[in-house]
């Protein structure tokens, strides 16, 4: 709550006026997510086992790589082996650098990952590729629900080169109705539409990014309100 200082009743009456107060914009967050063919992954931010609030983000801010529950499968990462993963199995918690993004208005944004050894699990494709966000999904809108925002003009960028463009991406309505959050899908081998049209382009060796445009958020912001104010709130209190 904004604190106001007053300069005395008589002076206050002389300088009384109004102050237009703009409602603060809501800030949301977006994260890249993926699963490789051998199931190395970064899950959605709100995942109950590997999300950002689990173990202070230990798993979410890394890449989970399976290795047959054997710490010697990838000897160069033996010190990263965790034999007590959240689901009870053992795997590698491999460091990576993620670019997550805050969204507070309509515009174009980018999320991504670098500093990961993409050749480690010998994969060449994705089971899943997505952007998970905490932008609300209205499960009561229409038959399948809908996000409060629209996503468009998406680009998948591999090693600095645009390898796919998606003008109108698929929103995961099934997940949205369960989680209340918006997830944007680019690959999902278990989704009928994406089996055919999902991402099947180049596989990263250095970096993976997803660029996307968000619209409709500005319309969600509350209108400015007008509140009364008295005096100059930047001056010190001179009451005695």
Predicted regions and their residues:
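Gram-positive cell-envelope targeting signals
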Residues: 1-27
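Beta-rich carbohydrate-recognition modules and glycan-binding surfaces
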Residues: 25-224, 228-231
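Long, low-complexity, intrinsically disordered segments
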Residues: 235-240
């Amino acid at each position: 709550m904004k604190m106001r200082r007053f300069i005395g009743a008589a002076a206050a009456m002389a300088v009384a006026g109004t102050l237009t107060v703009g409602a603060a914009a809501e800030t949301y967050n977006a994260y890249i997510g993926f699963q490789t063919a051998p199931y190395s992954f970064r899950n959605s931010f709100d995942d109950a086992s590997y999300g950002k609030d689990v173990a202070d983000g230990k798993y979410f801010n890394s890449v989970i790589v399976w290795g047959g529950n054997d710490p010697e499968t990838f000897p160069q990462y033996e010190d990263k082996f965790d034999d007590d993963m959240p689901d009870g199995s053992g795997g590698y918690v491999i460091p990576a650098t993620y670019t997550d993004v805050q969204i507070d208005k309509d515009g174009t944004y980018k999320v991504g990952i670098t500093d990961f050894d993409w050749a480690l699990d010998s994969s060449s494709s994705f089971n899943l590729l997505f952007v998970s966000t905490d932008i609300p999904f209205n499960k009561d809108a229409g038959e399948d629900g809908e996000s409060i925002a629209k996503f468009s003009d998406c680009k998948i960028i591999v090693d600095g080169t645009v390898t796919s463009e998606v003008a109108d991406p698929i929103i995961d309505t099934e997940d949205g109705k369960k989680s209340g959050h918006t997830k944007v899908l680019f690959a999902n081998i278990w989704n009928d539409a994406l089996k055919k049209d999902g991402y099947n382009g180049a596989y990263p060796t250095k970096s993976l990014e997803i660029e996307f445009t968000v619209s409709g958020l500005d319309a969600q912001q509350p209108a400015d309100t007008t509140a009364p104010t008295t005096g100059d709130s930047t001056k010190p209190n001179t009451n005695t």
